[in-house]
Amino acid sequence: MNIPKIPLAQTVILQCKKHGISHVIISPGSRNAPLTIGFSNDPFFKCYSIVDERCAAFFALGIAQQIRKPVAVVCTSGSALLNYFPAVSEAFYSKIPLVVLSADRPEHLIDIGDGQTINQQNVYSNHVVYNANLKLDIREESKLHELNIFNNPENKVVCFLSKQKEIDAYNKNEISIALNECILQSAPVHINIPFDEPLYETIASYNITISEDTDLTNSYCISDINNIDEAMVEWNNSGCKMIVLGVLHPDVIDNSLLASFANDPSVIVFTETTSNVHHPNFFPCIDKIIAPLESIEFKELKPDILLTFGGMVVSKKIKAFLRKYQPKKHWHCGFPNAYDTYFKLEKHFKVKPNEFLEYATKRKLFHSKSDYRKVWLNIRNHRRKYHKQYMDEIPFSDLKVFDQVLKRIPDNTHLQVGNSSAVRYVQLFEINPTLEVFCNRGTSGIDGSTSTAIGASLATSKNTLLITGDLSFFYDSNALWNNYTPNSFRIIVINNNGGGIFRILPGNKNTENFDTFFETKHELNASNLCDMYNFGYQCATNQKQLIDALDSFFNKSKNPKLLEIMTPSTLNDEILLSYFDFIK
C-alpha cells in the first residue's frame, strides 16, 4: 500500500480513520496530493472523485445527511476551498457533520505573489464549529538551518527531533479536537493543512502512530429532563397550545408518542413535509391552512404556548403569524441549540424529542374545556374539501403538476426537493407517509440541490427522486458530472422558463426589467445535458403527456432518468394566488 511520506498527511489520514470517517470526496489538485494518495490507497476509505468543488461539497453533504456521520472533502490550495463555502454554510445551519480538509502552501509562501495561494486559515470562521490550522512538518535536512540553535550538528539533530515531536503533538491534538467537535455538535469543521514540496513521495507503510483513545464526552447533550416538571404545570394550565415541527429525520420522533402527548383538545400539531412525521390528528400543509385566515381569526387562534421540535421551518406564513400574533411563551426541545425564530423563546429543553415526549406525557393533564383543536380541525377540513375541488378544476400548471406527480411517486421513495418554489408547492399537499423527504433548508439556497440528492442516493437503500425547478437544476448542472449516480436515480425538473417564484412575490411583476433581472427568463431545456451525462430523457408539455411519462418513469432502467415538465410561466402565479382565495 502506498502511503504519503509526509508525516502530517499520515496524521490526518489516521485520525480520520480513528474517528470512523470512511467517506472521502476528493477534488483534483497537486497540493492535496499527499492526502489524495493516502486516502485513495487505504481500503478503509470509500473515495469519490468530483472535479467541481462546490458540487463535491454538496455531494458530501448529501451522504452525511443520510448516514449522520462526518464525511470529509479534500481540496487543493487557493480558491478551491472557497467553492466549498455554500455547502459549509448549509451544513452549519442544517447541523450536518462535514470535515473540510484543505491543503495549503507553507506560511512563508503566503502573500508574496506565489501562485494558487490565498489566506486559507479561518476562512469559514463564522460557519464552522472549529478551525484547526496545522503546522508544517520540519522533515528535511535543508530545513535544519532554520532552527534557532548553534551550528553544532549534534544539537541540530536533537533540536530537529524535539521540534518535530512538538509539531506532531500539536497537529494530532488540533485534528482530534476538530473531529470530536464535528461529531459531537453534528456540524462542519475546517482543518487547514500546509504541505511543502515534494508532494508525491510515498513509503510502504505508516511510520507514525495514533493513540486509540477517543474522548467523546458530549457536554452539548447533558439532559435537563428534570426541568420539564415545572414547564408541564404551565402546559396543563393553558387552553391553547401549538406544536410546530421543523426539519427532522424520519426516525427522530415517534409518531405514536407525539400523538399521545397531543391527544388533548387544547393542543394542535403543525407538521411540514420535511418533518417526516405523519398522523391523522396532525395538521400538515401549514400554508394551505393558515394563508386564507383573516386578522380577526389570527388573533383568536394564536397559542398561549408554542412548543417546537426540529430544525428550520419552511413556511413563511407560520413565521409571520407567530411573530405578529405572538404566543406568551415559546419552548424548544432538542440539541444542540434553539433559534428564537418567533422572538418569544423562553425555554430550551436539551433533551431528545422522544425522551421529552415520554416524560412529559406522564405528567400532562387532559384539558377538557378547550375547543382550540376543534376550531383548527374545522378549518383543516374546510381547506381539504376545497383543495380537492380546485385541483380537479385547474388547467395544466405548476400546481397541477405537483398534484399529479406527488400522487404517483412509488411507496418508500427517498424524496429530495429543490428550494424556492418547489418545496413550497410540495408543502401544499398531504404526501404519501412512506416517503422520506429532505431539502437543503439550512440556508435555503438553490445552488446544491442536485449534488446533495445524488450524494444522498448513494447513502440510502431506497430509490431517490429529486423534484426541482429549472433555475436550480441548471445552476447545479455540474452535479451530473460524476461516475457514481445510480441507475435508479430520478430527476423531475419543472421548467417554467425562469424563476417563477418571483411572479408570486408581491410587487415584483411591476418592476422594470422584471423578466431579465428577477425572473431571468430563458428558453433552455435539459435534453442536451441528459445526452452528455447519459441520462434517459422524457419531456411533458401537457397533462396527458405527463401522466403517460409517469406511468413508466419509475420503472427499472439501465441509466438514471430525467423528466422535464414544461409549464406556462404566465399562468402559474395566477393559478396559485387564486388557489388561496378559492379555499377560504
Question: Where are these predicted regions, by residue range?
Answer:
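Phosphate/pyrophosphate-binding active-site segments
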Residues: 1-4, 141-158, 162, 320-421, ...
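Glycine-rich, anion-gripping cofactor-binding loops and their flanking helix/strand elements
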Residues: 83, 245-331, 432-461, 474-478, ...
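Active-site diphosphate/adenylate-binding microenvironment
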Residues: 9-13, 20, 27-31, 35-36, ...
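Conformationally flexible catalytic loops at phosphate/diphosphate-handling active centers
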Residues: 3, 149-165, 172-177, 181-237
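Glycine-rich, acidic loop regions that bind phosphate or pyrophosphate groups
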Residues: 102-175, 270-379, 484, 506
